[in-house]
Amino acid sequence: MSKITVIGAGNVGASCAEYIAMKNFAAEIVLLDIKEGFAEGKAMDLMQTQSLNGFDTKITGTTGDYSKTAGSDVCVITSGIPRKPGMTREELIGINAGIVKTVTANLLEHSPNT
């Protein structure tokens, strides 16, 4: 089995992690977010559904600690900000591109073979 990291523990990231767990695509999932305690809480919520949903995947959450992503076979980036009223798509993609660049640099440092 493998290790999968999901960056961003919002609705998309948490749903992605839940689907990966329910399909038993990985032995371990790391859910990472920048909001303090957010990914840890989502991971605990998902782990509490383990027996109900019939999966054995270990799910852990972390706040910005990319060292916990080390050895990941796959990394899924779902992080970014939503478009705000009055914001152009060009402004949004500029901000989200910066987020993806930072996330990618951190992932490559800890899981260079991802």
Language-model segments: what does each one mean?
Residues 13-14:
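N-terminal Rossmann-fold NAD(P) dinucleotide-binding loop
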Residues 79-81:
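Conserved NAD(P)H cofactor-binding loop of Rossmann-fold oxidoreductase domains
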Residues 34-72:
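Conserved N-terminal Rossmann-fold NAD(P) cofactor-binding segment
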Residues 9-10:
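Glycine-rich Rossmann-fold phosphate-binding loop(s) that bind the pyrophosphate
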Residues 20:
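Aromatic pocket-lining residues of Rossmann-like dinucleotide-binding sites
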Residues 1-4:
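Extreme N-terminal starter segment of soluble prokaryotic enzymes
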Residues 88-114:
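Rossmann-like NAD(P)(H) cofactor-binding subdomain of soluble oxidoreductases
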